């Protein structure tokens, strides 16, 4: 959702207070609070990388509130012309950030600079783990690592500003990170590599589920979950899950 938030800040030139970081668990509460705050003057509500429930949609429609949804989770498909649920785009997996970017560009809220295209593509490859090359995997891992270091709010503000710089031709494609960030990312990845490599067939429990050889990994720190899974399956292809 951070990529979508950066696009909202940049594309709509809006204030941070108008962008909310929601999960399926707190979405209804946030929408309810904004409906109470704005009354009959609630502006168009945009949902990206998260889909409102049928109950939320019913409340918005009852109040006559305009809304749009940009999501790539097929399980969230709901009957409404305002909802764009796409798992694929141009023949490959897509994500909420890419769907939102396409709409913003088509409606002239932003122009698709090379920097913007690279930023969105890195997020897409990471979000759906669709890596076309080792280089693509590395770029995605670096951006995700910076996200972990900065946290969602700082990451969003930093890249909303960089998108603005790129729009003014003050930042080029490939200039995703500054020198300090590159050093911080490198140090963090070194530390993460030690954790990831510590998981081997000898250190995990193995069970068979519906004919699939499955590794049960206990990660007490709760970090790098996707990377541990991805690296483990790549190193030990005899496992299915």
Show which residues each predicted segment covers.
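Eukaryote-specific, cytoplasm-facing alpha-helical/coiled-coil scaffolding segments in long proteins
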Residues: 150-151
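Long, charge-rich alpha-helical interaction segments
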Residues: 154-191
């Amino acid at each position: 959702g951070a990529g979508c938030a950066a696009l909202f800040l940049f594309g709509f030139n809006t204030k941070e207070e108008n962008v909310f970081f929601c999960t399926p668990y707190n979405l209804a509460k946030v929408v309810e609070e904004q409906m109470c705050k704005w009354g009959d003057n609630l502006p168009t509500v945009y949902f990206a990388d998260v889909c409102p429930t049928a109950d939320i949609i019913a409340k918005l429609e009852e109040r006559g509130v305009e809304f749009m949804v940009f999501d790539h989770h097929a399980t969230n498909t709901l009957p409404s012309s305002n909802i764009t649920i796409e798992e694929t785009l141009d023949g490959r997996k897509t994500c909420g950030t890419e769907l939102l970017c396409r709409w913003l560009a088509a409606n002239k809220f932003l122009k698709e600079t090379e920097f913007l295209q690279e930023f969105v593509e890195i997020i897409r490859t990471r979000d759906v783990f669709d890596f076309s090359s080792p280089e693509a995997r590395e770029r995605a891992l670096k951006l995700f690592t910076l996200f972990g270091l900065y946290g969602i709010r700082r990451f969003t503000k930093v890249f909303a500003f960089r998108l603005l710089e790129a729009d003014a031709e003050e930042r080029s494609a490939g200039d995703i990170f500054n020198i300090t960030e590159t050093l911080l990312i490198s140090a963090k990845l070194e530390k993460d590599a030690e954790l990831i490599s510590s998981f081997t067939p000898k250190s995990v429990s193995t069970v068979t589920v519906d004919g699939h050889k499955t590794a049960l990994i206990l990660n007490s720190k709760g970090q790098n979950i996707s990377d541990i899974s991805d690296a483990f399956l790549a190193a030990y292809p005899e496992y299915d899950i």
